[in-house]
Every structure is written in structure tokens, then in C-alpha cells.
Amino acid sequence: KELSNVNLVGLHCYDGQNGISDVNERLKAITKLVDIEKDLVAELKKLGYEVMVISGGTPEFPCYRKLSNFYVSPGTLFLQDDGYSNAFKDMDYECACCIMCRCVSHPNAENFTLDCGTKAIASDPAVRGVIAGLEGKTEIVLQNEEHWVFRMKAGYENLKPKVGEVVYVIPTHVCPTSALYPYALVVRDHKVVGSWQIFARNRKIIF
């Protein structure tokens, strides 16, 4: 169908279903998709359309680079999180975002509370983040809007943060976490050297 103000210039083939942890299984699934996408491009070319293809999210884009000359479109581009770092070991992601918070109380001998509630970190994943330096040593008790209560696992009680101590939480899902803040502080060699404004959090419909 002809539309006077619309031109077909490309295909955006996002395949979020292929976020498979095993790299060989991921590559196998994406190989099938690339074949389909190439066939579609060939059919469109017969009809007179020269199109580009944009494909591949954060877990998938390295596979597309091996299999095609498509443009790739990783969504988690600047700051990696604990979710992708754990799920895709083959990609050797380094966590590059954390939330600075503080231990505000010791409800009992095992538990401690951080001032990092659901207002401070994305609440969509079941495990919303990990405490840097205490990975695997704590259990989550509860989280509400302002606070997050943890329990030290048996044998690690001596590592419980002191009241007033600064603690760093690495989010499981950085994308909606970053949208909760107007800017991010940039740290290099343990020193704050600048800040980045989070422009994408300011959304507005203009039509």
C-alpha cells in the first residue's frame, strides 16, 4: 500500500526472547532468525526496497555481529548491572552502576536496614540488587518504600555493616533504576570526577 508521507527504509527485528544464558544455544536460536531476516530483505529487494536491518538486544548483539552485517541495538549500553553480569558470563560484563546508601539500624543481632527502598531501585526483578562486597552472604527480609532489611547468613554475622556505614548496592536492572535519578555521579579511581544528567527520564508526548 502506498503512503505518500511514509517510506520503508528498514526493519527493526528485536528478539528479546533470545536472552538465553548458554551462548551456544543463544547463537543457534539467532542463526535461525538471521536466515529469516535475510530472506525477508531479499524479498523486499525484489519489490524495489533497499532496507537496513536493526536487530539484537544486549544479550544477543554479539551473535548478530558474527552472523550478519546488520546494525545492532543493545539497550543496556552505558552502565551494566548485576542481572546481565550474572546471566551472560560469556560477555564478561563489568558492573558499572551502584546506589550509594547507608545502614540506618540493627533491628536485631542478624538483621540490618539500609535506606534503599523501592523508591531508590527498580522493583521489577525479584532480587532487586546485591550489596557490593557481601554477595552471597545476606538474605533479604523485606523491602518497603524507604527501607530494605537484610539478614546476615550464618557464619557471616561479623560482616554486618555498622549503623551509619555507607554501603553500595548494585542493581539487578539498571535501566529503570537510572530513571529514578536526575543525574549519576561519575567515579574514577575512587574519586567523583563529574556527573551525567539522565536525560531519558524526562519523557513528554509532543504530538
Regions picked out by a protein language model, each given a short descriptive name:
Residues P59-G136:
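Active-site loop ensemble at the mouth of alpha/beta enzyme cores that anchors a bound cofactor
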